[in-house]
């Protein structure tokens, strides 16, 4: 069984347990009361290098990264460094994330917050809104076409935005009609957790017209960003390097100060 299969099996069990503890109707009522959504796509649309800075305690491929991190402190540092948005892992079994991490991070900043998890069920969409997130991750690889379309529509209907994640050409073809405003291109193969940092550049020009590409995974340095800018996106989702950094705010300042026009590549926008 692959890492991804293990994660999805655990997630199905987690959803079933959550339903027993809290009916979906309760979450629907909380979601309906939300009037404080922060614009996720709008934050990424601004000029220059835009970074979604991630709060992540652990991962299946790396094990513990920084299990004792303070999500509020890290979120404040990310905002001070010029992050465009936050991404917070809420998956507990493999990434040691939690709803509490997301709530604590969002409470101390004005940045839009992406819930990073394995969303499979409408229950989780309402749960995402109820916990205070502004956007959620939808991974094309783990959803069939009907589920992808219905979860996207449900999210939009209650005010949530989506980052729709692809990994290869087949995924890219599947979202042509959906045309999501923001598309994450994961350089990491979720089945085996192998990373190929050239993947985002190869797929950026295969996206639907109007979809903003975000490169995710394997970005650790200014050189990585320069290389990506030369032929691909100017938006990045970065976690491990920032979580490990002694001064994440300063690192973000360095990265976001890079000039897209100075790279001289064929950015797909």
Region annotations inferred by a language model:
Residues 2-68:
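An N-cap/entry alpha-helix motif that binds or orients negatively charged groups
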Residues 7, 53, 78, 86, ...:
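Conserved, mostly hydrophobic/aromatic
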Residues 127-147, 185-193, 231-252:
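Glycine-rich phosphate-binding active-site loops on the catalytic face of alpha/beta enzymes
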Residues 10, 56-58, 91, 118-119, ...:
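Active-site beta-loop-alpha junctions enriched in small/polar residues
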Residues 202-206, 229, 242-263:
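C-terminal helical cap(s) of enzyme catalytic domains, especially alpha/beta-barrels
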Residues 182-224, 229-238:
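Catalytic-face loop-and-helix region of soluble metabolic enzyme cores
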Residues 55, 61-163, 169-174, 200-203:
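N-terminal active-site wall of soluble small-molecule enzyme domains
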């Amino acid at each position: 069984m692959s890492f991804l299969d293990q994660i999805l099996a655990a997630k199905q069990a987690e959803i079933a347990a959550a339903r027993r503890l809290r009916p979906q109707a309760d979450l629907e009522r909380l979601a309906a009361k939300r009037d404080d959504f922060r614009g996720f796509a709008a934050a990424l649309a601004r000029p220059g290098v835009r970074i979604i800075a991630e709060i992540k305690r652990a991962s299946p491929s790396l094990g513990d990264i920084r299990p004792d991190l303070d999500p509020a402190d890290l979120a404040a540092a990310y905002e001070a460094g010029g992050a465009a948005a936050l991404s917070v892992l809420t998956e507990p079994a493999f990434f040691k994330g939690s709803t509490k991490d997301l709530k604590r991070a969002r409470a101390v900043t004005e940045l839009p917050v992406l819930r990073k998890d394995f969303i499979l069920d409408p229950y989780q969409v309402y749960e995402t809104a109820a916990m205070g997130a502004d956007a959620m991750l939808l991974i094309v690889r783990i959803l069939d076409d009907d589920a992808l379309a219905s979860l996207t529509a449900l999210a939009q209907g209650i005010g949530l935005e989506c980052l729709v994640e692809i990994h290869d050409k087949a995924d890219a073809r599947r979202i042509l009609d959906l045309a999501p405003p923001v598309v994450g291109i994961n350089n990491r193969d979720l089945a085996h957790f192998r990373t190929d940092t050239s993947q985002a550049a190869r797929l950026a020009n295969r996206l639907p017209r109007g979809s903003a590409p975000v490169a995710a995974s394997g970005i650790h340095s200014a050189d990585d960003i320069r290389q990506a800018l030369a032929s691909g996106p100017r938006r990045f989702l970065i976690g491990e390097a920032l979580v490990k950094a002694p001064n994440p705010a300063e690192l973000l300042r360095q990265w976001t100060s890079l000039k897209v026009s100075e790279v001289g590549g064929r950015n797909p926008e």
